[in-house]
Amino acid sequence: MPLHRGLAAGVLTLLTIASVIVAQAPAAAQENNDPEAVGSVGIRLLEAPVSLQDDPRAMAYIVDNLPPGTTITRRIEVSNGSDREQTITLYPAAASIGEGADGFQIGDGRAVNELTTWMSVAPTDVVLPPNTAEEAVVTIAVPEDAPEGEQYAVVWAQTADAPTETGIQNVSRVGIRTY
């Protein structure tokens, strides 16, 4: 009996080690070893309404209660903190409030909702040299016939490398919540 227990323990140990190696293999196969990989993109709000100066969210997020027929603009800054030139795409996308830690849920990709149809970002694409930043403007034009109520979105700054021969594409997005 003791021989079988020792053999079983040895086999179990080998199986555990093998499963750890196999479980990590797919991640290692997809690892990007490019030191200048996509990333290091930043975005921040540069201004907030005077009426919201005491609201701590107002300098981090676009926070406004806009009546129908109102148009606002907010200046933002997008930055490239990498060591190479990057093309950064700016666009709004849908979000919602739901269950979870903070409740703010972002839609897939360039998902559209009512608020995103009222939003624009100019410029939509910026080419930034290494370690530089550029301003952009977010405009929200609420139509006259818009329903009252809260709307949610995010303004994205995104970079993307071309897909590899295996179809893998690195995408980096950072955003500003819009309430």
Feature map (PLM): residue ranges:
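Terminal connector regions
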Residues: R84-A111, E135, A141-Y179
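Asparagine-centered strand-capping/turn motif at beta-strand->loop junctions
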Residues: V78-S82
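Secretory targeting and sorting signals
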Residues: M1-A29
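Short Pro-Gly-centered flexible turn/kink motifs
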Residues: G69-R75, V127-T139
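Short secondary-structure capping/turn segments at boundaries of alpha-helices and beta-strands
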Residues: A60-V63, T73-E77
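Surface-exposed binding patches on compact interaction domains or structured appendages
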Residues: E31-Y61, D83-E135
